[in-house]
Amino acid sequence: MSSGPRVVDNLEIAQRYISEAAEAGAVVVALPENFSLMAKNQSDRLAAARVENEIHTFLSEAAREHRLVLIGGSVPLPATAGRVTNTCLVYGRDGECLARYDKMHLFDVELKDGESYAESRYIEPGDKLAIVNAIGTRIGLTVCYDLRFPEVYRELVRQGAELLTVPSAFAISTGRIHWEVLLRARAIENLCWVIAPAQTGDHPDRSTWGHSLIISPWGEVIAEKPSGTGPIFAEANLMELRELRSRFPSLEHRRL
């Protein structure tokens, strides 16, 4: 997706992509970080947070209508002291909310050429991991900058995760060098499927790298969106994943 500052427009686009994925037979659909709003300022985020029920309803109805598990990227939800959480919501095939994950690691960095980010000024970090039991497996939830903290993924795997989701809005300067490398590393070291839907293109206050990816537990890029917007697809064979973990039991060889 290439989300903008109007929630209603972003939800309309998301609905189109969800429907397209469902028609292709998808049983799990994941949206990118900030799918409902790429804000110009904090007042826009707070305004979106105040209409959170609209976004909840959208996700619930889309999941129920298409009978799929819908991983809602991330949305702004009300927090304290004028801040919001950057929250991934997951809805099941019956439209019920299965899990909530608040992004733990906030992007406070200074990049080259004056590009800087300070998410902690307007986002309240989460402090709990989240795993979803669905489609006969366990899905570990993360968001964007969490990707740089491998201990998060190792703990999710320790708790039984076989699929890892990383909805993101990576900066172009970091995405060009780090995005695919980090995702493949998380897949390889944890012997997990990695699903990474990404924002792309120009937004009100920034540009994003895009390149949504689905990566196998062996680190192979199975599906990629090298440019533009729209869904990508892959079949995650869980029996093959479990057989791989049995033949190549690196997760059982840990010493720490």
Over which residues does each language-model region extend?
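Active-site catalytic loop in hydrolytic enzyme cores
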Residues: 79-159, 172-174, 179-181, 247-250
